[in-house]
Amino acid sequence: MLALAAALIGASTLAVTAASAKQEKTINIAYFAPLANSYVQGELAGIAAVLKTNPNVKLTKVDTGFDATKQYNSVQDAITQKKFQGFIVLPLDSVGLVPAVNQAIKAGIKVVNADTPLGLRQDTVLPQVPGETGTVFDPWTLRGVWGAQLVIKACQGLSPCKVGWMSSVAALPAEKAYHDTVMKMLAKHSNIQVVAEVDGAAYTVQGGQKISQDLLTAHPDLNVLVAVGDQPAAGAVLSIDGAGLTGKVRLIGGCPSRISKPLIKSGKEWGSWACFPADEGALALQFLLNGIDGKLKKPVGASATVVALRKRKLSPLITKDNIDKYPMQYSGS
């Protein structure tokens, strides 16, 4: 893990030169993502900061929702327009999107994927598609290690420790990698029992509230509740409060936002793992511009969170004891 972090930091060093680069020719970039998602809006805030120093770069935002087929078709449509020099994609189907990206690369378009991997492997930030310019995301296997560490800490002193699991979109390859990594680590602890798993939080407060209500009704004796995503964790806080279980159920989210910060500080959300979506968006665009400028000699990859944590000398595990040390880079709404 330390070797991976060191490699990621080394890769990020190459990217910092792009933001100051001034281009005379207009560069058109397309960004493919579920635009209503607040994490995506955090990424776009980081991209906007880079755009301010590169006024010749024009960004077109393409809303794909959480529809992998729509995303695939949107990438193909953008290729046929023959106006874009670069794509930033947030892959909804890590493997299924590869043929469309191959078409883009063949057409001379530089491509960077962010937030989730592009290719079969979920455990590396190194680009997997030949000809791709770069990748910027936190491997969901790494996030899974952090998530498991939080559950293990929350379960200390409890035997049995009954755990409930709330997926957001369980079919997403990245989310499956997160789930499987956590479960593999928890299986090594005899006191931890995963008693229920539900799906459908959809990375929203409303989705998290609904399915957590159902879960708590069926299992009111839970000790720990894991929400995949920050927004559903905020919804689960409402359900836990409504059931009179505040202080009895330890809630673990992921990637805290401005909404969840006060929840973590108050103890209503027990813990979360760190993320830096604005840094991720900025780094993705910086990699892409370096690729378009011809400054990259080979594909590059990095985790913006690993880079930020090393720079700030922070732990990836966030609780009420240390949350004030972390910037919240998206709204969470």
Regions found by a protein language model. Give the residues of each.
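Extracytoplasmic "Venus flytrap"
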Residues: 26-54, 60-78, 89-95, 169-177, ...
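Short, low-complexity disordered leader/linker segments with a strong preference
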Residues: 1-28, 52-53, 102-107, 325, ...
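Hydrophobic alpha-helical
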Residues: 76, 89-107, 181-182, 196, ...
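Short, solvent-exposed amphipathic alpha-helices that sit
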Residues: 39-53, 143-147, 173-193, 207, ...
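Flexible loop/hinge segments that line or gate small-molecule binding clefts
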Residues: 100-142, 162, 257-265, 269
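Hydrophobic alpha-helical segments within soluble ligand-binding/sensing domains
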Residues: 71, 133-161, 207-208, 256-260, ...
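Hinge/cleft segment of the Venus flytrap/periplasmic-binding protein
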Residues: 25-27, 123, 166, 170, ...
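Short beta-strand elements in bilobed, periplasmic/extracellular small-molecule ligand-binding domains
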Residues: 53-65, 165, 186-205
